[in-house]
Amino acid sequence: MADDWHFSNVPLMNGEEYTVRQLVDSMMLVSADGSTEALALADAGSTAAFNKKMMAFAKKAGVTDIKIYNMIGLPNGDLGKHKLKGVDKDAENLLSAKDVALISKYLVENYPETLDITKQKFANFD
């Protein structure tokens, strides 16, 4: 995923080391799927474990009626070796605009440093 230009506008090279901040910046500033996947898997260990953590986070934000299939929001089949087994290849995350707003509000209120990242006008990903 991280080296496929279809999914990652900030390619990650196998064998290279990246800081968490580099991955977070590329994830939050330019929506780099490879960085998102790397962070989620490093934190949770698997797509299924990440989904459980994301559902718990959403619940804290007051959101309970959503479906999370992966950390990126792509169809399940696009995740290659990280796709969920036994789940349709076309399954995608399902949440409303209100759900996204509630999760975003919770994120900013509880992790205000998020704004320091998202207010950057540019970042170097070399």
Model-predicted segments: where are they?
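Conserved catalytic neighborhood of penicillin-recognizing serine enzymes
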Residues: 4-40
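Short, glycine/proline-biased beta-turn/loop segments that scaffold the active-site neighborhood
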Residues: 1-13, 118-126
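Penicillin-recognizing serine hydrolase domain
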Residues: 20-26, 41-126
